Regions:
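GNAT-family acyltransferases
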Residues: 1-115, 128-132, 136, 142-145, ...
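Short alpha-helical segment within the catalytic ATP-binding CA
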Residues: 111, 124, 152
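Glycine-rich acyl-CoA binding loop
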Residues: 118-123
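Conserved beta-strand-loop-alpha-helix junction that forms the acyl-donor binding cleft
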Residues: 144-154
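Conserved active-site tyrosine of GNAT-family acetyltransferases
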Residues: 157
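Structured interaction and signal-relay segments at domain junctions
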Residues: 160
């Protein structure tokens, strides 16, 4: 499988159907989901279907940036699955209206196993994805959203150069969201 990119400690590659059990295990951790919301799917088949839908939308779509999609994050030395990153047109986000996203904006997101927290993996991978996305003509800004209480996530955004750009009310969430942006 083609590798999207490597950083000093990470290898990012497109998610494959073989990653479905890894995603299910990641989403089974209530602490991982505490500030994120519901899991991507509720069954192994649901995760497989989620991954399969990424290919026509991002990975096999000639009109899509080669950077867009959901990427498995693996430790380079060991190959251990740590979590994932997403990079996609911001208009693909389910709360696009509430987040005030616009055409040309690219959303970055990430989700990691607890064992990978606090080690700089999210920052390392996100910085590289942000750097590469800003090189594309179609990108006007990098955007991201987190619940205000999720300081670990907002610190990653800040380390990538994004700045807080306002509060967001997300349907179904008791906590307030915050929008971050890095204009090109």
């Amino acid at each position: 499988m083609a590798i999207l990119l490597q950083t000093p400690r990470l290898r990012l590659r497109p998610l494959t159907p073989e990653d479905a059990p890894r995603l299910a295990a990641l989403d089974a951790d209530t602490d991982v989901l505490r500030y994120i919301g519901p899991p991507i799917a509720t069954s192994l088949q649901g995760y497989e279907e989620f991954i399969a839908a990424l290919y026509p939308k991002y990975f096999d779509n000639k009109d899509s940036s080669p950077l867009y999609g959901f990427w498995a994050a693996e430790e380079r030395e060991t190959g251990v699955f740590l979590g994932w990153f997403l990079l996609r047109p911001a208009l693909d986000y389910r709360f696009v209206a509430e987040a005030r996203y616009e055409a040309g904006q690219v959303e970055i997101g990430y989700r990691f196993h607890q064992a990978a927290w606090g080690k700089g993996y999210a920052t390392e991978g996100a910085q590289e994805l942000v750097r590469r996305a800003l090189l594309e003509d179609r990108t006007s800004a990098i955007v991201s959203l987190a619940l205000v209480e999720n300081r670990a996530s907002t610190r990653v955004m800040e380390k990538c150069g994004l700045v807080r750009d306002g509060d967001v009310v997300l349907p179904g969430y008791a906590m307030r969201g915050v929008r971050y942006v890095l204009w090109k």
